[in-house]
């Protein structure tokens, strides 16, 4: 980053910079405008669409991953459930919907919950939602037996 390399270093890991070009921009302020940031795509199928309360009914407890989810009460909202979950991609903080107006609001091991109230397209059962992903998600996804990897 600063133009110099210690004499004894003989291996430089630049995987994320070449594959995604996210970290250099996000953490180090390096402008990576010339790099494609959409070379990996996570696609997940919508398996349910319903209007539901934005705040769960009942008591909120610790989930299977040791976290207590927090929800903002925004009234009844349109929700979509995807047939993919944390065991497939890691954390919801590491997947980024490409469709404007879609927000990832939660996930279990096997499912992901989206708020689609403000989505630009009308999602229906069987539709595919695309996500940009970060390096950690690539690690999970490429090691998951449930995920089909397609090279284009």
Could you say what each language-model-derived stretch is?
Residues 1-152:
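Active-site anion/phosphate-binding pocket segments in diverse small-molecule metabolic enzymes
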